[in-house]
Curated annotation (Swiss-Prot):
Pathway membership: Carbohydrate degradation; pentose phosphate pathway; D-glyceraldehyde 3-phosphate and beta-D-fructose 6-phosphate from D-ribose 5-phosphate and D-xylulose 5-phosphate (non-oxidative stage): step 2/3
Record bears the keyword GTP-binding: no
Protein name: Probable transaldolase
Gene Ontology biological process: carbohydrate metabolic process; pentose-phosphate shunt
Cited function: Transaldolase is important for the balance of metabolites in the pentose-phosphate pathway.
Gene3D superfamilies per the UniProt record, alphabetical: Aldolase class I (3.20.20.70)
Organism: Desulfatibacillum aliphaticivorans
Cross-referenced Pfam families: TAL_FSA
InterPro entries membership: Aldolase_TIM, TAL/FSA, Transaldolase_3B, Transaldolase_3B/F6P_aldolase, Transaldolase_AS, TSA/FSA_arc/bac
């Protein structure tokens, strides 16, 4: 399973990358805005740090504008993936961009039919939002299971990119279901490495070592 980090903060990206936790990065307008720096500067810094897919999202909602914006974003770096919302105009843009060899990550996906449509349109990645679905009906992981089944049934090249990850259990369940990628906030990445027994065991080892020096 590939791990992407869901952030636009370069310090978080560098720290996670130093631990081998970053195969790619996803951003969105909200994450970019939090950094208080020019959009293109942030994206270029991320591309310089991570040699993998970097999702940058369009802000247009009309197909022609999304296509134009997507081409401009793709010109920033070879690793840019264009993030497109799951709307009818978005599927037109997805088809057009993917036909020109520009990879697309279809975002804001909440149903298996949306996921199927996005794959048919040529998306390289499709991002189901498991946390937001769980907020409504606790069905986030059911969607992942359905998507993996559908994509396997028809040998789609589209990758399931699990998004809106709220806790380590989301990552574990997605991995067990065979999802290709999880995009994970930095705080959740850190939680994935922790366990009370690890802390207890380390404390005991260190205490024994200190005793041995006396």
């Amino acid at each position: 399973m590939k791990f992407f980090i869901d952030t636009a903060n370069i310090d978080e990206i560098k720290e996670a990358n130093s631990m081998g936790m970053v195969d790619g990065v996803t951003t969105n307008p909200s994450l970019i805005a939090k950094e208080g720096r020019p959009f293109e500067d942030i994206i270029k810094d991320i591309c310089a740090e991570v040699d993998g897919p970097i999702s940058a999202e369009v802000i247009s909602t009309e197909a022609k504008s999304m296509i134009e914006e997507g081409k401009k974003l793709a010109a920033i770096h070879k690793n840019i993936v264009i993030k497109i919302p799951m709307i009818p105009d978005g599927m037109i843009a997805t088809r057009a961009l993917s036909s020109e060899g520009i990879p697309v990550n279809v975002t804001l996906v909440f149903s298996p039919l949306q996921a199927l449509v996005a794959a048919k349109a040529g998306a390289a990645f499709v991002s189901p939002f498991v946390g937001r679905l769980d907020d409504l009906a606790n069905e986030g992981m059911l969607l992942i299971e359905q998507m993996v089944t559908i994509y396997n049934n028809y040998a789609f090249d589209t990758e399931v990119l699990v998004a809106s990850v709220r806790n380590p259990l989301h990552v574990l369940e997605a991995a067990m279901m065979g999802a290709d990628v999880a995009t994970i906030p930095f705080g959740v990445i850190k939680k994935m490495m922790g366990h009370p027994l690890t802390d207890k065991g380390l404390a005991a080892f260190l205490a024994d070592y200190e005793k041995s020096k006396k």
